[in-house]
Amino acid sequence: MVLVRVLANLLMLQLSYAQKSSELIIGGDECNINEHRFLVALYTFRSRRFHCSGTLINEEWVLSAARCDRKNIRIQLGMHSTNVINEDVQTRVPKEKFSCLSSKTYTKWNKDIMLIRLKKPVNNSTHIAPVSLPSNPPTLGSVCRVMGWGTISATKETHPDVPLCANINILDYSVCRAAYARLPATSRTLCAGILEGGIDTCKGDPGGPLICNGQFQGIVSWGSDPCAKPHEPGSYTKVFDHLNWIQSIIAGNTTATCPP
């Protein structure tokens, strides 16, 4: 009888903890430590605080958002918990940075992309490995995975110790146009989210990856303010539409131009 009571009390504590944990996040959960080997954190030397994410696409190149550009950027790879550091964490600085437009003049609606060449290549390890560029664009309705260390509250800037992951859907571009009146008629972006709200990327997540069916399809760009509002999905730079530019830069053609 005593054992039954003890087990019942433990179950109640577990349920209570689970409920409180779910109330602390914008629709996400802690990522599995093995599912984000390509996810990198961007921070500045002075702040030491993650302001953006990025995606490792080979041992020497990281793809992020133009809005994430800063002076004295540091790139941390192999991170999971900010409290318990993985043994294979590596830190790099940029050798070169390329954007379609200057980070000061890019439009909020388009061309939010930055390619970073690392000063020193990284070594693949238990928690570090690149992700492949997409072979095809994502299909409408695809279930995609977003991840990052962005704020876990829509009203107060509170960052988690570990990256959070959540599933969202690729939506028709017209859904984003209906939500944001200033969007152009066409754009090289993806509209993605949950129409009911409650699940969204937020401050600190820009530059991170949108993974659809195992392929790197989007770069977190911007969304509603406050985050996770119903019928106001997020905007993601469409990686597939920028493949030629990305591959040309990596191949050494540093004067390559982005798609119009």
UniProtKB/Swiss-Prot annotation:
Pfam families associated with the record: Trypsin
Main location: secreted
An annotated Gene Ontology molecular function: toxin activity
GO biological process, one term: proteolysis
Residues cleaved off as propeptide: 19-24
UniProtKB keywords: Disulfide bond, Glycoprotein, Hemostasis impairing toxin, Secreted, Serine protease homolog, Signal, Toxin, Zymogen
Annotated Peptidase S1 domain residues: 25-251
Superkingdom per UniProt: Eukaryota
Tissue specificity comment: Expressed by the venom gland.
Subcellular location: Secreted
Glycan-carrying positions: 123-124, 253
Gene Ontology, cellular component aspect: extracellular region; secretory granule
S-S bridge residues: 31-165, 52-68, 100-258, 144-212, 176-191, 202-227
The UniProt record lists the keyword Signal: yes
Signal peptide coordinates: 1-18
InterPro entries (alphabetical): Peptidase_S1_PA, Peptidase_S1_PA_chymotrypsin, Peptidase_S1A, Trypsin_dom
Its biological purpose: Snake venom serine protease homolog that may act in the hemostasis system of the prey.
Assigned protein family: Belongs to the peptidase S1 family. Snake venom subfamily.
PANTHER family: KALLIKREIN-1, KALLIKREIN-RELATED
Protein name: Snake venom serine protease homolog
Species of provenance: Protobothrops jerdonii (Jerdon's pitviper)
